[in-house]
Amino acid sequence: MAQNFTKLNPQFENIIFEHDDNQMVLNFGPQHPSSHGQLRLILELEGERIIKATPEIGYLHRGCEKLGENMTYNEYMPTTDRLDYTSSASNNYAYAHAVETLLNLEIPRRAQVIRTILLELNRMISHIFFISVHALDVGAMSVFLYAFKTREHGLDLMEDYCGARLTHNAIRIGGVPLDLPPNWLEGLKKFLGEMRECKKLIQGLLDKNRIWRMRLENVGVVTPKMAQSWGMSGIMLRGTGIAYDIRKEEPYELYRELDFDVPVGNYGDSYDRYCLYMLEIDESIRIIEQLIPMYAKTDTPIMAQNPHYISAPKEDIMTQNYALMQHFVLVAQGMRPPIGEVYAPTESPKGELGFFIHSEGESYPHRLKIRAPSFYHIGSLGDILVGQYLADAVTVIGSTNAVFGEVDR
């Protein structure tokens, strides 16, 4: 029986629609396991079809941008770990890259090699984590177990380098805190071989799996126009056939010297995005294999040399009075960049991650803005989910690879 316009209170205070017996409103999350703890979707259904989807975010909001405006530039670095916590070194680097651009610092080549290795290692760890969790959401439990075993060995490498497994804090403004430990590169080579084997195993389990393909093919289709209008980036954009990768378009660190491809999709569906994550693991392995021989050819400095912004090496601080005073000022008061503003984009595992910094010449930013890819991808669910079956909502949400640490900030 048809009913009049109905206003539902209090949980659905903003939803007004004329419904019949085939229509209903479903509150998806934030408790649902596939909403990853922080996403609420208000879904309007007609039968099994979604006719409207309203994402609601903010459950993990911590005021990260305002925190950055009340800390010195170096103090803020550990906070960036808590954005995309599945690839925290990428967040560290994106922030450091923006500050270094503002300061016009020249980074030593050895530090660039180490940074690029860490970025690509983090990319592989993030990608294999996505594939495992996405497969688990769809129902492939065994893939989750195999992938997590390999991911653990990647995290062991990060722990050997910086002492932390998840929130690495592995980058510094001006370089890196540590040189690579002895035999670390040998462990990295072993991990690359293990990652190749894990990738082959996952492809054997999924690529020709009829259920997996039925759940992903033609589900969550994104068109090039939709991707551009929503400001999508990364694999969400490249899945539509647009070959845009900031490592190619605006190269940073050593990417200009490296030989790698940018895989693109054809259909823009969830299966295309899964395939691109698998292909990008191959490209990261290819990049690291080019970087390993570069490391031995570099000199030892791992931090930029600029007494106005960067502390002297520890041996100088312990033996030279001027270096000690300079270090005291930088720690107690913080560096003071010139007046100006900068936006520096980077290609994180999720897409375009950039920091906008406006400086008034003080020891903390006047304005700090984070451009996080997951924020735009979650917003696009309002378009992508319309017309999909309710059972496919989990697949579509998972295929965006959104992490809510950088959605809510």
UniProtKB/Swiss-Prot annotation:
Taxonomic classification: Bacteria, Pseudomonadati, Campylobacterota, Epsilonproteobacteria, Campylobacterales
Chief place where the protein resides: membrane
Entry-linked PANTHER family: NADH DEHYDROGENASE [UBIQUINONE] IRON-SULFUR PROTEIN 2, MITOCHONDRIAL (PTHR11993:SF10), NADH-UBIQUINONE OXIDOREDUCTASE 49 KDA SUBUNIT (PTHR11993)
Quaternary structure and interacting proteins, as annotated: NDH-1 is composed of 14 different subunits. Subunits NuoB, C, D, E, F, and G constitute the peripheral sector of the complex.
Membrane topology annotation: Peripheral membrane protein
Protein's UniProt name: NADH-quinone oxidoreductase subunit D
Function: NDH-1 shuttles electrons from NADH, via FMN and iron-sulfur (Fe-S) centers, to quinones in the respiratory chain. The immediate electron acceptor for the enzyme in this species is believed to be ubiquinone. Couples the redox reaction to proton translocation (for every two electrons transferred, four hydrogen ions are translocated across the cytoplasmic membrane), and thus conserves the redox energy in a proton gradient.
Organism listed in the record: Helicobacter acinonychis (strain Sheeba)
Gene Ontology CC terms, in alphabetical order: plasma membrane
